[in-house]
Structure formats: structure tokens, C-alpha cells
């Protein structure tokens, strides 16, 4: 949202016209706090089919919309998922990660929670790249037709792997297995 909003809108409109899924990440709480960035996000929102973020970004979005400060992450995700869309080819899905707490998925009026992989505090090395790794794992399963539970499991695996290493690095061989 901070750069090339015109390009984002062109891709968003094209995706809607071609009935392709358009995915966005909330990116950072400041996006919702800086008026030009928030305006760009809200212009894009009707085109977003999959929105991913973390609990801090979801709370910042809710605050920027004037929603009650005591809303749960599940309620925020549900409310965002029901916001108006430009196309009807698919429901909007909102996925919110919550660190050590379950990942929330809201779509079609339903909210589900998906467990993360437990990790002892002493195993936590570096959280940089965890959100990007989660999205990579999530999308890797969605593009091959897996359901939200399996996609979240892959996303949580990728994030869990990243946070146990310095920098955004992976082991030579993954240990993820498909359900």
C-alpha cells in the first residue's frame, strides 16, 4: 500500500474481471494508521479475496474502522470477511495468525481456528520472516487444492521452522508431511 497503488488496483480489477483470486497481506499496523495508506487499502478491499495478517494488524484495522476495542480476533476476521466485495466469484477469506495462539480463518460466515506447532521459548531464535513464511506455506497448499486446515498446517509449519533459525532461512530438507 505504500508504493504503486495504481498497479495494485490494476491487478485487483483484472483479477475480478477474470474471476481470479486476489490476495493481499495487511503488512503492518501502520498501514491502517497513516491516512493515505489506509485509503489505498480500503479502495483495494472490495477486490481482496484472501486477506492475511497477524493479530496486531487485525487489531489496528479494527481500531481504524472504529470497531469496539474488545472485539476478539475471530470477530474481527469474521467482520472483515463480510465487507462488500466487487466480484461474487468467491467469498472473501480472512486468515489471522496469532503467534502461539491458533490461526483464525473466517469465510462464508464461519470462523475456524487451526492449531500452531508448540515451541518452547528457548527454541525461539528470530521472528523475522515468520509471516512471509506462513503465507508461503498457506498458498503452497491452496494452489494444489488443499483445504484451509491443511493450508494453515503448512503455513504454521513454515513459520515454526523460520522462527527457530537466524534470519529467514530453511533447513536443507523439510520435514513437513501432507495429511
Give the location of each predicted region.
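Ribokinase/PfkB-type carbohydrate-kinase core domain
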Residues: 1-113, 117, 168-179
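Conserved post-catalytic alpha-helical subdomain immediately downstream of the catalytic base
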Residues: 82-93, 100, 117-179
Amino acid at each position: 500500500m505504500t508504493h504503486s497503488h495504481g498497479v495494485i488496483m490494476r491487478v485487483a480489477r483484472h483479477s475480478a474481471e477474470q474471476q481470479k483470486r486476489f490476495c493481499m497481506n495487511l503488512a503492518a499496523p501502520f498501514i491502517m494508521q497513516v491516512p493515505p495508506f489506509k485509503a489505498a487499502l480500503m479502495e483495494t478491499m472490495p477486490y481482496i479475496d484472501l486477506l492475511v495478517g497477524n493479530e496486531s494488524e487485525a487489531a489496528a484495522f479494527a481500531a481504524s474502522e472504529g470497531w469496539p476495542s474488545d472485539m476478539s480476533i475471530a470477530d474481527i476476521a469474521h467482520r472483515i470477511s463480510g465487507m462488500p466485495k466487487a466480484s461474487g466469484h468467491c467469498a472473501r477469506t480472512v486468515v489471522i495468525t496469532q503467534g502461539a495462539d491458533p490461526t483464525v480463518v473466517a469465510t462464508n460466515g464461519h470462523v475456524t481456528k487451526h492449531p500452531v506447532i508448540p515451541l518452547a521459548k528457548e527454541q525461539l531464535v528470530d521472528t523475522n520472516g515468520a509471516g512471509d513464511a506462513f503465507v508461503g506455506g498457506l498458498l503452497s497448499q491452496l494452489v494444489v487444492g488443499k483445504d484451509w486446515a491443511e493450508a494453515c498446517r503448512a503455513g504454521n509449519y513454515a513459520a515454526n521452522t523460520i522462527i527457530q533459525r537466524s534470519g529467514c532461512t530453511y533447513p536443507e530438507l523439510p520435514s513437513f508431511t501432507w495429511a
